[in-house]
Amino acid sequence: MAKQRGKLIVISGPSGAGKSTVVLKALEGRNDICFSVSATTRKPRPGEVDGKEYFFVDLDKFREMVENDEFLEHAEYVANSYGTPKAYVEKKLSEGMNVLLDIEVQGALQVHQKMPEAVMVFIIPPSMAELEKRMRSRGTDSERKIEARLIRAKEEYAAADFYDYIIINDDADKAAKEFSAIITAEYCKYDLRKNYLSEVD
């Protein structure tokens, strides 16, 4: 029997939603999920390994990849370019791995256009008040930055109807179980299992 193709799982949500915590809890004990590796023009930091943290490329190579449509999405951030290489994602999916892409809404919509079969998951806190509380509890952001992030969060919420699932992260353990359940449910869909029906007399 041919190896079942993996799923591309796109996760988005506002800063402070707890995406990283939820995902890391959900990944505990699983070996069927890997994070996507982005290409970047940023210089490697001490200890970073090419192909592990990022694929490090120069600007000319990055532009060539853009022109050749080699990215599922790409964007510029703090004077550096970042992109999700199609080839890496396709290789992992063909190996049966579920590929996790934690990305902001604009990039997620780019991915959805190129791979409509991607599983789109939006993680949010139980309320905007809770989101603001979490941002302030960090104690690292200025008032201006917090206000900007809250405005950005409202803009991201407006794009949530492009997503397949919404996880309300009021409890990280519960949210992680919901995330794992989503992956399980995706493999139980009719189109993936309809061949078994032909075996019924």
Predicted ranges, named:
Residues 19:
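Conserved lysine of the Walker
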Residues 2, 140-141, 155-201:
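NTP-dependent small-molecule kinase module
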Residues 40-99, 106:
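ATP-dependent small-molecule kinase phosphotransfer cores
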Residues 27-36:
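Post-Walker A helix-loop "phosphate-sensing" segment adjacent to the P-loop in P-loop NTPases
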Residues 12-14:
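P-loop (Walker A) phosphate-binding loop of NTP-binding proteins
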Residues 99-104, 113-137:
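Conserved phosphate-donor/acceptor-positioning beta-strand/loop module used by diverse small-molecule
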Residues 1-8, 31:
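Extreme N-terminal, non-catalytic leader segments
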Residues 22-23:
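Post-Walker A alpha-helix
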